């Protein structure tokens, strides 16, 4: 993995790229050493298994050596994109420990954006990254309710539910922004919006 990352960074540097977006939270897990989230299954094939090195620390060191910035890229809500059995998750995964924090949609599991405990978990995750790593930025992707997540009564004539959902997302984004700025005010924070 390290050799592959170095090759990618060298190619990016040679093409004039100055900032790398590195996915650090694909499924409520971590591509970095975390006391909050388990190791990502993307590293070893088994969620919770230590890969023997810290990919985020490695990429930051290698990118900074090349004069490149690194933004940690997170999917805040996605837990499982295919399947709904929390028992397949690592025993220290918050979703397995507390399935009441989840919503099911399209055969996958997501943290429920309505819940303050979810907002706190996401904010704590970002705070851990910003505190422990010389990161240049944090970027969110898929920071919304699943597109076709059903409305409580099937429709929302007055937009009350849609407005409440937007407000929950706004609250989470503001909480994360405040967390970042309270730790390292210079770290950038961005969101990759999805066109609807």
How should each PLM-predicted stretch be described?
Residues 1, 37-52, 105-120, 158-168:
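The substrate-binding groove and active-site-proximal loops of carbohydrate-active enzymes
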Residues 1, 61, 71-72, 77-132:
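Active-site-adjacent "subsite" loops/lids of carbohydrate-active enzymes
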Residues 2-15, 42-66, 167-175:
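Aromatic- and glycine-enriched glycan-recognition loops and surfaces
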Residues 15-51:
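Aromatic-lined carbohydrate-binding/catalytic grooves of carbohydrate-active enzymes
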Residues 32-44, 78-106, 143-160:
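Aromatic- and acidic-residue-enriched segments that line the glycan-binding/catalytic groove
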Residues 60, 64, 69-81, 139-142, ...:
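Aromatic-lined carbohydrate-recognition surfaces of secreted/lumenal glycan-active proteins
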């Amino acid at each position: 993995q390290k050799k592959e990352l170095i090759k990618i960074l060298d190619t990016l540097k040679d093409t004039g790229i100055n900032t790398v977006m590195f996915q650090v939270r694909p499924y409520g897990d971590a591509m970095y050493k975390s006391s909050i989230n388990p190791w990502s299954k993307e590293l070893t094939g088994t969620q919770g298994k230590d890969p023997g090195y810290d990919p985020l620390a490695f990429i930051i060191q290698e990118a900074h050596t090349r004069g490149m910035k690194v933004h940690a890229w997170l999917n805040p809500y996605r837990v499982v994109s295919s399947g709904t059995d929390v028992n397949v998750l690592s025993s220290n995964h918050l979703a397995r420990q507390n399935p009441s924090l989840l919503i099911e949609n399209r055969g996958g599991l997501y943290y429920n954006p309505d819940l303050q405990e979810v907002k706190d978990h996401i904010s704590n995750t970002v705070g851990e990254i910003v505190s422990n790593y010389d990161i240049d930025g944090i970027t969110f992707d898929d920071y919304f309710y699943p597109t076709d997540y059903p409305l409580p009564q099937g429709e929302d004539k007055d937009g009350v539910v849609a407005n409440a959902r937007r407000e929950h997302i706004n609250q989470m984004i503001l909480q994360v922004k405040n967390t970042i700025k309270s730790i390292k005010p210079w770290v950038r924070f961005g969101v990759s919006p999805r066109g609807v």
